[in-house]
């Protein structure tokens, strides 16, 4: 049985410990909404802001010509997500971001509003409650709504489905989050240069229910291998499979030190600079000259703090190989090449 969101093969003893009929468990796991832990307990994933926005956008378009109470939208990992629609009429729809077991997901329960009109082609706009990018170095250009590229693709794909279903020429959809500006103040957005609301994010379409129990699950996986790559996210995971094909790849997010505690043998830490270098030196951005590590890399690639943070990461790695990659998979830094 394989978790379709992270491609993790769930061990048979974990499956047995759930106590659920195999067919029932397989159906639920296949939906992407459940995570099975090593002790047999089950946690619920949620849908990202990107998936919720996609549902609101699609429902808004469909409501131009029909009644809508739920919608199915594509996700970046290839699964379908079905969400309830709170309101939908005359080109306006509301979808609530569902609950999940991620204890610190402050966007749970937020209303996402889509407002649509027929137009030429597909166009998605950011409305009230979606932050605006005010600094360079992020995935979204300065001055644009903070809708990351992957969820933007997802939203446009969902709108395209609705356009085809209704045989429209195209559609323009504005996404807004009425409570987004207030919630945005509780996030790190202002520190990285996003103002006025939250960001629309999500590389998989699903919110992982990260907590201490999942730390144990990953700990079990790390312990079981003597050749492991600890990676910080899905981009790192994708390219780690290519760079280290005979290693076990484990996604640990920002918990690099915790992952190292479980690891032995041949260990690699591989990921984007924002997490790996800041793990090496958490204070590398303290003077406020740059908002993000990416901005520092782009504007001053020879900045001494980059090398300093990398050297500190090597020291903290206690013999692990440290590999820092770019978003296209190119290797920026590799401790194997250090003299």
UniProtKB/Swiss-Prot annotation:
What EC number(s) would the UniProt record show?
Answer: 2.1.1.195
- GO terms classed as biological process: anaerobic cobalamin biosynthetic process; methylation
Q: The organism sits in which domain of life?
A: Archaea
Q: In which pathway does it act?
A: Cofactor biosynthesis; adenosylcobalamin biosynthesis; cob(II)yrinate a,c-diamide from sirohydrochlorin (anaerobic route): step 6/10
Catalysed reaction, written as an equation? Co-precorrin-5B + S-adenosyl-L-methionine = Co-precorrin-6A + S-adenosyl-L-homocysteine
Q: List the disulfide bonds.
A: none
Keyword ATP-binding recorded: no
- Molecular function via GO: cobalt-precorrin-5B C1-methyltransferase activity
Q: Which InterPro entries match?
A: CbiD (IPR002748), CbiD_sf (IPR036074)
Sorted alphabetically, which keywords does the UniProt record give? Cobalamin biosynthesis, Methyltransferase, S-adenosyl-L-methionine, Transferase
Task: Report the Pfam families cross-referenced here.
Answer: CbiD
Q: Does the keyword Secreted apply?
A: no
The cross-references to SUPFAM superfamilies, in alphabetical order and at most eight, read: CbiD-like (SSF111342)
- Annotated HAMAP family: CbiD
PANTHER family, per database record: COBALT-PRECORRIN-5B C(1)-METHYLTRANSFERASE (PTHR35863:SF1)
Assigned protein family: Belongs to the CbiD family.
Q: Under which name does UniProt file this protein?
A: Cobalt-precorrin-5B C(1)-methyltransferase
Q: Which organism is it from?
A: Methanosarcina barkeri (strain Fusaro / DSM 804)
């Amino acid at each position: 049985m394989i978790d379709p969101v992270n491609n993790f093969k769930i061990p048979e003893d974990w499956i047995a410990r759930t106590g659920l009929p195999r067919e029932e468990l397989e159906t639920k796991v296949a939906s992407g909404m459940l995570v099975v832990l090593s002790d047999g307990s089950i946690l619920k994933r949620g849908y990202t802001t990107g998936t919720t926005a996609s549902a609101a956008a699609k429902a808004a378009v469909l409501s131009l010509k029909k009644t809508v109470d739920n919608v199915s939208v594509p996700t970046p990992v290839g699964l379908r997500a079905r969400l309830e629609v709170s309101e939908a009429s005359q080109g306006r729809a509301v979808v609530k971001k569902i609950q999940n077991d991620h204890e610190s997901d402050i966007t749970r329960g937020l209303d996402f509003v889509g407002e649509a009109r027929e137009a030429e082609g597909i166009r998605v706009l950011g409305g009230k409650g979606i932050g605006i990018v005010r600094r360079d170095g992020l995935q979204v250009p300065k001055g644009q709504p903070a809708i990351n590229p992957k969820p933007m693709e997802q939203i446009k794909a969902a709108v395209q489905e609705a356009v085809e279903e209704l045989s429209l020429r195209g559609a323009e959809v504005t996404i807004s989050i009425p409570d987004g500006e207030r919630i945005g103040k509780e996030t790190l957005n202002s520190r990285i240069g996003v103002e006025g609301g939250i960001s629309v994010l999500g590389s998989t379409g699903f919110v992982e229910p990260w907590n201490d129990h999942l730390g144990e699950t990953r700990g079990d996986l790390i312990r079981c291998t003597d050749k492991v790559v600890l990676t910080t996210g899905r981009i790192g995971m994708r390219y780690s499979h290519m760079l280290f094909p005979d290693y076990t790849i484990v996604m640990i997010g920002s918990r690099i030190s915790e992952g190292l505690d479980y690891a032995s043998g041949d260990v690699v830490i591989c990921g984007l600079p924002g997490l790996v270098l800041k793990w090496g030196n958490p204070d590398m951005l303290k003077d406020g000259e740059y908002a993000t590590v990416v901005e520092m890399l782009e504007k001053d690639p020879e900045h001494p703090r980059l090398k300093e943070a990398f050297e500190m990461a090597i020291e903290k790695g206690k013999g692990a190989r440290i590999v820092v990659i770019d978003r296209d998979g190119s290797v920026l830094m590799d401790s194997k090449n250090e003299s």
